[in-house]
Amino acid sequence: MNNEQPKIPQATAKRLPLYYRFLKNLHASGKQRVSSAELSEAVKVDSATIRRDFSYFGALGKKGYGYNVNYLLSFFRKTLDQDETTEVALFGVGNLGTAFLNYNFSKNNNTKIVMAFDVDPDKVGTKVGGVPVYHLDELEEKLGGITVAILTVPAQVAQPITDRLVQKGIKGILNFTPARLHVPEHIRVHHIDLAVELQSLVYFLKHYGNE
């Protein structure tokens, strides 16, 4: 995000892309203003939380009028650095990795996977979704200045790969493996364990489904 913006709570920062996506849809439909109640219904975040999130950035709307869609869209585009492209490297071209490469964040103009790594000789040297696949041994040579990585590799190799990424100056890792990665404090890791998320969903459906 833009370093000139005020520091905001992490929970708020995670919701900003959600707001931005909805505002893009509103803009595309020709809508010129939106209320916090409408935003709340669309993104499934309560109105009070939305107003508090927006308050960290000053007066973005007017009471009784709502929010100007074009203004908000422009503001959040700048806040989220949507005019700058962040290049990403993906590790592990299995089923999940292949899905990422074919999708390649097509709805997010500022994020793009530009290279992938694997050890399968049938995949190395090919392109998946237009993205070149290199051998893992080429990591140090090919990574260059990329600072964001996605891991979709077997759990047992996640930490060794992470250690190499740390040495290359990586700043952020989106980890889809069950492994809990150990990194220096200045490196950001988001763990996404799909099996755990699914188990959690099933549990809540069984025990809290009627609430």
UniProtKB/Swiss-Prot annotation:
Gene3D superfamilies xrefs: NAD(P)-binding Rossmann-like Domain, Winged helix-like DNA-binding domain superfamily/Winged helix DNA-binding domain
Predominant place of localization: cytoplasm
GO annotation terms (biological process): negative regulation of DNA-templated transcription; response to redox state
Keywords linked to the UniProt accession: Cytoplasm, DNA-binding, NAD, Repressor, Transcription, Transcription regulation
Compartment(s): Cytoplasm
UniProt GO molecular function: DNA binding; DNA-binding transcription factor activity
UniProt keyword Transcription regulation present: yes
Residues engaged in binding NAD(+): G92, V93, G94, N95, L96, G97
Pfam families in the record: CoA_binding, Put_DNA-bind_N
Gene Ontology CC: cytoplasm
DNA-binding region: 18-57
InterPro entries for this protein: CoA-bd, NAD(P)-bd_dom_sf, Rex_DNA-bd_C_dom, Tscrpt_rep_Rex, WH-like_DNA-bd_sf, WH_DNA-bd_sf
Function: Modulates transcription in response to changes in cellular NADH/NAD(+) redox state.
Cross-referenced PANTHER family: REDOX-SENSING TRANSCRIPTIONAL REPRESSOR REX, REDOX-SENSING TRANSCRIPTIONAL REPRESSOR REX 1
Similarity comment: Belongs to the transcriptional regulatory Rex family.
Subunit comment: Homodimer.
Protein name: Redox-sensing transcriptional repressor Rex
Source species: Anoxybacillus flavithermus (strain DSM 21510 / WK1)
Gene designation per UniProt: rex
